[in-house]
């Protein structure tokens, strides 16, 4: 349903005419993250997909995007997989949570994982949604100065992340 493996980043430099000719943005782009199917009371079943914006050259995470697609109808008709919404400013912290997810349907949360490179080792961090909707508020699993883990609503600082790696 999409002819390309990514959606266009708002900072991408190619013109619409260049894209129509088949060119692909080589500077700013989004990489596909994970996705979930959410039963939205207003729209029925929707596919919620996280996209990670990457910086040209370094491929460093710089921002995020949440795009929602309709799952109403049947494959091949005009409504199925049509775009319902796109939030280009979604979780624009550049931390990349959601490259891998776990849906805890019994607990009512989606757990979102990211990694942070420390020398030659990738360290794991985790966040979770308040509900089974990716657009609901997120909490971040951090270890406080006493060594105890808990969930906090604010994005962790670099110091909090360093204390909170999951091993």
Ranges and model annotations:
Residues 1-28, 37-93, 104-167:
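Beta-rich carbohydrate-recognition and catalytic domains
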Residues 32-34, 98-100:
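Conserved beta-strand position repeated once per blade in WD40 beta-propeller domains
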């Amino acid at each position: 349903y999409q002819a390309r493996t990514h959606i266009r980043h708002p900072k991408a430099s190619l013109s619409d005419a260049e894209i129509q000719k088949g060119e692909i943005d080589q500077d700013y782009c989004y990489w596909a993250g994970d996705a979930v199917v959410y039963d939205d009371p207003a729209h029925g079943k929707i596919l919620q997909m996280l996209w990670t914006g990457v910086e040209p050259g370094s491929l460093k995470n710089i921002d995020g995007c949440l795009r929602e697609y309709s799952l109403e109808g049947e494959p091949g008709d005009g409504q199925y997989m049509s775009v319902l919404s796109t939030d280009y400013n979604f979780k624009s912290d550049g931390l990349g949570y959601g490259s891998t997810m776990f849906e805890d349907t019994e607990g009512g949360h989606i757990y979102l994982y990211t990694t942070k490179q420390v020398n030659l080792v990738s360290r794991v961090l985790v966040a979770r949604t308040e509900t089974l909707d990716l657009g609901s508020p997120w909490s971040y699993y951090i270890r406080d100065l006493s060594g105890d883990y808990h969930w906090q609503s604010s994005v962790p600082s670099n110091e909090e992340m360093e204390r909170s790696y999951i091993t």
